Amino acid sequence: MDVTDVIEPAEQLSLETAGCRNVSPVLNRVGDKWSVLIVMILADGPRRFNELKRHIDGISQRMLTLTLRGLERDGLVSRTVEPTVPPRVTYALTELGESLKEPVEALGRWAMAHIDCIRAAQQRFDARG
């Protein structure tokens, strides 16, 4: 017998709400536009900070720093400092970050396949005033 078979509906809703609450911060991180772009770039291999900044149009130095720190905190990106002068800092996907490549690529493919439909829907919505 499955545990959900013996849980009352109100309890089930409570468990689902708790699950959403637990997953929400993770989805906020991996669903953030800058995080997605960083994961896509690092999927091709390790990069230095300025390389990432050059590849991501419109991101400020502060936002790149904050996003990388968040990804590092969540275990998705590693930061390696080489003891050179000046210090060389390299960012790479961790094993956990590597596991995010496929879903991010799938999301990108979906977006590219449906961009025309989405733009048309936006235009219809905006035309309503």
What is each model feature region?
Residues 3-7, 15, 93:
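Loop-helix junctions at membrane interfaces
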Residues 83-107:
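Basic, amphipathic "hinge/linker" alpha-helix immediately C-terminal to the N-terminal HTH DNA-binding motif
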Residues 2-8, 101-129:
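Amphipathic alpha-helical dimerization/coiled-coil segments
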Residues 46, 56, 68, 97, ...:
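Short amphipathic alpha-helical/adjacent loop interface patches that line ligand
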Residues 64, 68-71:
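Basic amphipathic alpha-helical segments that dock to polyanions
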Residues 13, 17-63, 90, 98:
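N-terminal helix-turn-helix DNA-binding core of bacterial DNA-binding proteins
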